[in-house]
Every structure is written in structure tokens, then in C-alpha cells.
Amino acid sequence: ITMNTLNQQYEEKVRPCIDLIDSLRSLGVEKDLALPAIAVIGDQSSGKSSVLEALSGVALPRGSGIVTRCPLELKMKRRQEGEEWYGKISYQDCEKEIEDPADVEKKIRDAQDEMAGVGVGISDDLISLEIASPDVPDLTLIDLPGIARVAVKGQPENIGDQIKRLIQKFIKRQETISLVVVPCNVDIATTEALKMAQEVDPDGERTLGILTKPDLVDKGTEETVVDIVHNEVIPLKKGYMIVRCRGQKDITDKVSLTEAIEREKAFFNDHVHFQTLYNDGHATVPKLAEKLTLELVHHIE
């Protein structure tokens, strides 16, 4: 099932809101009027890019180390069944249409190299990627660089602070919903991304947690993960979702995004511990897409 499960009524309510926000943002109204946005943050290797990739249906730059080197605004617009896929990338004074979904990753890498320098720096400038297709939800997300603990060769010593400063700039605004991506195989309480979200949003009013990599969960900690998603460990007003996206092996094995959604559903459906989360509507990427769209609308209202 693609995103077509999103109710028509939200389609009618959501689309006008999102179009309005996008056009205001492109007119530069941002400066005087704070527009609602969803910012995606996570420690490095949290599975952030995989979540965005699953939502957008296109491959984004991924790998170890700093992959997202500039803020990437991902504008997704849902098209009618049968309509063509459309893509466009804009940054600085440059705007290019993208013919083929397979070219997106390279175009983003080129744009990042142009803006942040080839290699290892980061930049505050926004790259905007617009995608229209029958298979995406109506959503605009801003992907921010992963939080790095230590600088690698060639990076400025203070790269960690630079990234934090950049993230802070986005998430401290009251209009921003922070999407905090945390893998199931780490202790959520120690993740830097959640700490940062808590600093700017102590009551968890506008923070939503996403747990990734449930297939890598340490044996014996599954029930803790269930408790986290049930909002019983670190409560957030917007709660938690759990997803399983393509890992490196799936990509090597050429598992398509559509196939990955089927596999994800089967994974949760058959999982002794996580099945309840699936039944409660707390699991899978399509459910996440639905929740994000609703959250954005509530936030706008």
C-alpha cells in the first residue's frame, strides 16, 4: 500500500496549508513570519537518511560520517494516480529540474559540495528538493546534519559545535516540530539529539520520537523498546513511532522502496514483541507519514 491510505479529507485540508507555507517560504516571508516546519535530527548513523528516503521514495546520500552537510528541505507533494514523477533541486541562485528519481542522490551531493566545499565542511545554506509523485505524502521536512561526537580527519575541531549550532537554530523556533531519530540498539536517554530537543522543548510539546533499526535491538531489551514507544519512559506529547527502513544490506541486495514497505509490514506483523506496536498504529513508515501530516496540520491550526 502506498501513501494513498491518507484520508481524502486531510488531503483537502492539508494540501492548501502546505502549499501556502511553501509559497510564503519561497517568497522569503520566513524572516518576519515564523512558518511551521518539521526538522529531522539524530545522532550520526541513527538511520535518519533511511527514514527520509522511505518517506520520499528517493535515495538520498547516506553512508558513515557526515552525510547531510547542509540543511535539506524536502518538499513532497502528492500527485494524482497516474501522474508523472517530478523533481526539482534549488540552492543559492541555482534551480535544476530532475528527470529521473535515480539522479536525486548525485544532485544533492553536487549541491552540498558546491555549498559546503568538497569533502568535510558543513554549511548553513538550505538546499531545497521538491518531489511530486502519487507515492509521497504531502509534507515538508527539513533534514539537518547528524550530530557528530568527534571530528574526523580534515574536519574542523569544532565540527560538533558547528552542527549543534545549526540544529539549534532550527529547532529552537516554537513553530518547529522536532523529529528525533533514535536507533533501537542504543540507550535513548543518552542520545544527543533527544537532549538537544529537550533543551529547547523541555515539556516535549513539539517533539516526536522515531525509533529505527528494530531488527538490531539487543536481545532482552525488546520490552523496553515497547515501553518507550508507549510513551512510558521519556514521555513526549507527540509520542513515538517505530519504523524499519532499508539497511545497507537491503540496498546492496537492490531491495526497492516499495518492497521495503512490504518487508517492514511483515517484520512488525510477525514480531513477538513489536506486533502490538503495529496493531496500535505506532509502527511502519506509511503510519509515520500519516501521523506527520496530521501533526503538521494541528501545529498550523
Curated annotation (Swiss-Prot):
Q: Locate the region G5 motif.
A: 244-247
On induction, the UniProt comment says: By interferons.
The similarity comment for this entry is:
Belongs to the TRAFAC class dynamin-like GTPase superfamily. Dynamin/Fzo/YdjA family.
How is this protein named in the record? Interferon-induced GTP-binding protein Mx
For the region G2 motif, give the residue spans. Answer: 67-69
Recite the lineage of the species.
Eukaryota, Metazoa, Chordata, Craniata, Vertebrata
User: Where found, per UniProt?
Assistant: Cytoplasm
Q: Which GO terms describe its cellular component?
A: cytoplasm; microtubule; nucleus; plasma membrane; presynapse
Which segments carry the region annotation G1 motif?
42-49
